[in-house]
A protein has these predicted regions:
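Loop-centered beta-sheet repeat module
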Residues: 158-220
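Phosphate-backbone binding and catalysis cores of DNA-processing enzymes
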Residues: 2-157
Length: 220
């Protein structure tokens, strides 16, 4: 199998590996071996460009498998951000990765969620309540139930849980909202601009470092 891996200088290098060696290298790259375990949750999240976090508890287990001795409080008390990244799905990421991930994925995720909002007939309502959403989350972090209550108190009583499921990623794709590891949300400043080509190159390099060796098609 022709593969690519991150070279010492950060660029890809090619080669051929048998299946057993390929599995060993991928486990090591994902910090799933004792020798390559991460020192803390931030290092673990950086190593794999974020862990899936649709389920908050499952995300904690994914981090625990990479950080020896990790407990739930370590995750909840960390600086990790819960947001929508690849494929429009929720991941826990290190804050330092937010600017370049947003540069690569923000526009496409915004288009995805724009479409979903329009299909549900929620787009115009969402635009009118966006300012209140950011203001409410700027006061203090809230879970979805708390957010619904606060928005209802500000004159948006018709917003349901299903609408929030689209509203939150839509706001996050604009850089205005970020999630906490415990499942709550807070207001956020849009991340600093990053050159799109540089951000894309960073994604390729980091993907190979965290999931390689990989075939060129895996980066498509």
């Amino acid at each position: 199998v022709l593969i690519l891996a991150a070279g010492n200088g950060g660029g890809p290098r090619g080669g051929r590996l048998d299946d057993d060696r390929l599995r060993q290298l991928r486990l090591a790259a994902q910090r799933l071996t004792p020798e390559t375990a991460a020192a803390d949750v931030s290092a673990a999240a950086r190593a794999v460009v974020g862990v899936q976090a649709q389920d908050v508890r499952a995300a904690g287990l994914a981090l625990r498998s990479r950080v020896p001795g990790l407990c739930r409080a370590d995750v909840d008390g960390s600086r990790l951000i819960r947001t929508w990244t690849v494929r429009g799905t929720v991941h826990l990421i290190d804050p330092a990765d937010r600017p370049w991930l947003h540069a690569v994925l923000g526009p496409r995720n915004l288009a995805r969620f724009d479409t979903a909002m329009r299909q549900r007939g929620d787009y115009d309502v969402a635009v009118t309540m966006l300012g209140d959403l950011v203001a409410v989350l700027g006061d203090c972090p809230l879970d979805r139930a708390g957010l619904l209550r606060e928005l209802a108190a500000r004159g948006h009583p018709g917003l349901g849980q299903r609408s929030v499921n689209v509203l939150m990623p839509w706001a996050a794709a604009q850089g205005l909202v970020a999630g906490l590891p415990d499942g709550r949300y807070r207001a956020a400043e849009p991340p600093p601009a990053v050159d799109a080509e540089l951000a894309l190159a960073t994604l390729a390099r980091r993907y190979l470092a965290g999931y390689g060796p990989a075939a060129a098609a895996d980066l498509a």
